[in-house]
């Protein structure tokens, strides 16, 4: 959910700490590669640990929901390293406290619901099937950016939406796909619906978050993005805790921990690892925005959607059906269209800067 507009890139560079400005080229590349590793690996690991939790006897959907945002205090570390921006303070004076609270509460509630749907989807689906379906978020991105953020839908974006939609439909109709929990076809369809609907909500909240920065807060800096991530995650975590107690799942946690096949220590480490990996992915995304650009960060995040289903097949030996073998290349083609369109947009921005500099 970390989206920063390219035309603001130069202005944000002025807030880069002097420590980064003193980096030589090799040090800069090391930090970039570390950030890429954090982003791709963390997103894949969080999905794999979530599937591992269910495979080994975990059954709490609300605990799985909580770990997706519960590690948000980690984000205070990178936030403390950033300088206080003038735009952040000016936006606070121009935007009422009630407006900020409303934004954090509404987006945080949406994130909490979104994470719950992701948890239900992962419960009923194999990790590879789940990851392929979650790639549909790119298709929804194009639609919401057009209607909410007034961004054009080019031919490449149209074909990206088309290919990703076809891939999602094929996977959802795959009769040979195995449900990891051995549930019925009905449960499999529920998992597919939850994964796709969660991707829709995720894309919607990205567009609404960018809309909030542009139209309400009137500014967008790295500090503000991290603050938005922290406070919305806090609200989403509260939603998960309320759901945990309201559903009565909290009473079964001690039994679940005792019956976890790999033992209580692994149970705790699995949940902690999932929570930490979710936040490390966020740190990696912010770092790439900081070191390179928002476009590059979004592209690497897109590439992680390709890595995750492949990692799931390798780790959990998910059933690679004929339909899935067709759906994955179609989804990858949709990724390619999406990435190439972003490359063209970035090229256009670079040329405009060069022309303005001359």
Swiss-Prot record:
GO biological process: purine nucleobase transport
Membrane-crossing segments per the record: 29-49, 62-82, 100-120, 128-148, 153-173, 189-209, 235-255, 280-299, 300-316, 320-340
Compartment(s) of residence: Membrane
Entry GO terms, CC: membrane
Annotated keywords: Membrane, Transmembrane, Transmembrane helix, Transport
Membrane topology: Multi-pass membrane protein
GO molecular function: purine nucleobase transmembrane transporter activity; purine nucleoside transmembrane transporter activity
Similarity comment: family membership: Belongs to the purine permeases (TC 2.A.7.14) family.
PANTHER family, per the entry: OS09G0467300 PROTEIN-RELATED (PTHR31376), PURINE PERMEASE 12-RELATED (PTHR31376:SF58)
Protein name: Putative purine permease 12
């Amino acid at each position: 959910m970390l989206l920063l507009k390219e035309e603001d890139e130069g202005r944000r560079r002025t807030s880069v700490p002097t420590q980064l400005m003193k980096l030589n080229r090799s040090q800069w590349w090391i930090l970039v590669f570390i950030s890429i590793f954090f982003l791709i690996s963390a997103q894949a690991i969080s999905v794999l640990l979530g599937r591992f939790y269910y495979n080994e006897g975990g059954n709490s959907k609300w605990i799985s929901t909580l770990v997706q945002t519960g590690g948000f205090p980690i984000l205070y570390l990178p936030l403390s390293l950033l300088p206080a921006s003038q735009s952040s303070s000016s936006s606070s004076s121009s935007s009422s406290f009630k407006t900020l609270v409303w934004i954090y509460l509404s987006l945080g509630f949406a994130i909490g619901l979104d994470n719950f749907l992701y948890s239900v989807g992962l419960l009923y689906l194999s990790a590879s099937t789940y990851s392929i379906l979650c790639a549909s978020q790119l298709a929804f991105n194009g639609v919401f950016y057009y209607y909410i953020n007034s961004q054009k839908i080019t031919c490449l974006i149209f074909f990206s939406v088309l290919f990703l939609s076809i891939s999602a439909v094929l996977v959802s109709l795959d009769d040979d796909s195995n449900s990891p929990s051995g549930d019925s076809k009905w449960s499999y369809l529920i998992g597919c619906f939850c994964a796709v609907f969660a991707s829709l909500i995720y894309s919607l909240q990205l567009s609404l978050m960018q809309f909030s920065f542009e139209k309400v807060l009137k500014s967008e800096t790295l500090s503000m993005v991290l603050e938005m991530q922290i406070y919305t995650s806090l609200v989403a975590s509260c939603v998960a805790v309320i759901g945990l107690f309201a559903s009565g799942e909290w009473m079964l946690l001690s039994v679940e921990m005792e019956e976890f096949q790999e033992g209580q220590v692994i149970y705790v480490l699995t949940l902690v690892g999932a929570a930490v990996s979710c936040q490390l992915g966020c740190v990696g995304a912010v770092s790439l925005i900081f070191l390179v650009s928002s476009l590059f960060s979004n592209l690497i995040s897109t590439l992680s959607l390709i890595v995750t289903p492949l990692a799931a097949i390798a780790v959990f030996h998910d059933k690679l059906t004929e339909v899935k073998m067709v759906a994955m290349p179609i989804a990858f083609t949709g990724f390619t269209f999406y990435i190439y369109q972003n490359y063209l947009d970035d090229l256009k921005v670079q040329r405009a800067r060069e022309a303005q500099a001359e």
